[in-house]
A protein has these predicted regions:
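Basic, amphipathic N-terminal segments that precede the first structured/catalytic domain
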Residues: 2-140, 333, 345, 349, ...
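Core catalytic region of metal-dependent phosphoesterases/phosphodiesterases
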Residues: 54, 83-104, 112-229
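Conserved protein kinase catalytic core
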Residues: 109, 158, 207, 268, ...
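Catalytic phosphate/metal-binding cores of nucleic-acid and nucleotide-processing enzymes, i.e., regions
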Residues: 127, 175, 188, 355-358, ...
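A short, hydrophobic/aromatic-rich structural module that often spans a beta strand
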Residues: 198-205, 357-365
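Conserved beta-sheet core of the metallophosphoesterase superfamily
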Residues: 215-246, 254-362
Length: 384
């Protein structure tokens, strides 16, 4: 008993009592490592953000470069304006026709029970439109046709990881569109003098951001198509490309001022929105007599404005996703010294219509409307 007590006493004497002010070296090392890891993570996050910003700009620049290269290669394969024999320009007429051309979405493919659309059907529908314009021209004694191009001639796939890989497809789709529109212009030129104006749409922009400045808004496939047609028809008698603007454009026909918009800047109250926009010009002393726009893919012609439908008609997204059905149609307006008569030309049924010839090997599509039906789901997400 006494021996055990003596051992416990010796053990207590051997114990070292640490003063609270003396720091544990292991704990200090651990804290230093944690601070170092946090600093490294902060630097890694900064580098990741900087690399992402550079990567996005580099992808866009590489995609545009590849697109231009492919486009030049395709242009070298065709003779755009050789061998043209144009009829003489009509010397007089009592009317001018305005063809409201918008939302053509050439590279969209639709295969529904109620509607089909591809490049061939687009060529048929434009051929049908030209025949209706010619009929109206004969009835009203028109000498000139003004084509107002209101944008969204192509669907653009703006996902950065697909921009470069789809450069060939987009260049081919651009030239398919040019080929069909070239035939459309030449068809009308058989009977009329032609003037063409153009603006950009929202769906055919190259960048994913919707821009309102001229620099951003003009980065569009609509401008590319317009410029190719303009250069291809340079020097052609009776075909004049008069002007292109990013968002809004004015032109005059028989003393009337027309305003061109795409339509994505117009709100739910169409009449109010149109009057607000024309009010800007009234403040500058410019009276707008009629406003032309599209965007919504549904025809609506009023006293002071006309909304165009699309050349496509209903697609998978509009029918299944929005429960919204529409027909393929474009507007034509007959302008005389005292009147502006507008009408919708129904282009849905093209049975028996011969399509314009185009290079079928250039067909390339963007299945954008069907992809809108698939809602992405995030399996695992880290938010910083």
């Amino acid at each position: 008993m006494g021996l055990n007590k003596e051992r416990r006493t010796r053990n207590r004497k051997r114990q070292v009592v640490k003063h609270p002010c003396v720091q544990d070296p292991d704990r200090e090392l651990l804290q230093f490592n944690v601070r170092l890891a946090k600093a490294r993570q902060a630097q890694a996050d900064t580098n990741r953000i900087e690399r992402k910003a550079f990567r996005e700009h580099a992808r866009v620049e590489n995609a545009v470069t590849a697109y231009a290269r492919e486009l030049c290669a395709r242009l070298e394969e065709q003779s755009f304006s050789r061998g043209l024999t144009l009829r003489s320009i009509p010397e007089s007429g009592d009317a001018v026709l305005i063809v409201q051309l918008s939302d053509l979405h050439f590279n969209e493919r639709v295969d529904l029970p109620s509607n089909r659309y591809d490049f061939s059907i687009a060529a048929q529908r434009l051929a049908k439109l030209a025949s209706r314009v010619k009929q109206l021209g004969k009835s009203y004694g028109a000498r000139k046709v003004v084509i107002a191009c209101l944008g969204d001639f192509l669907n653009s796939d703006r996902r950065l990881d697909e921009l470069l890989s789809n450069a060939t497809n987009r260049s081919k789709a651009t030239l398919c569109a040019v080929d069909i529109l070239r035939a459309f212009v030449l068809d009308l030129r058989e009977q009329f003098e032609i003037e063409v104006y153009g603006i950009t749409g929202n769906e055919s922009r190259v960048n994913k951001e919707l821009g309102w400045s001229d620099e951003l808004a003009s980065d569009s496939y609509d401008l590319m198509i317009y410029e190719i047609l303009k250069r291809g028809f340079a020097g052609a008698d009776g075909i004049a490309f008069k002007g292109f603007r990013s968002n809004e454009l004015l032109f005059e026909v028989m003393g009337r001022t027309f305003l061109c918009l795409h339509g994505h800047q117009i709100g739910a109250n169409v009449q109010k929105s149109v009057q607000e926009i024309t009010g800007k010009y009234a403040a500058r002393g410019i009276t707008v007599d009629f406003t032309l726009f599209g965007h919504l893919h549904a025809s609506a012609i009023g006293d002071y404005h006309a909304r165009n439908a699309s050349l496509v008609g209903s697609n998978a997204y509009s029918e299944a996703g929005l429960n919204f059905c529409s027909k393929a149609a474009q507007n034509v307006h007959v302008v005389t010294p005292g009147t502006i008569d507008g009408m919708k030309v129904d282009l849905q049924d093209v049975s028996g219509i011969e399509p314009y010839p185009f290079a079928a090997e250039w067909e390339a599509y963007c299945p954008k409307s069907e992809r809108k039906l698939h809602t992405p789901s995030v399996v695992y997400q880290v938010v910083v």
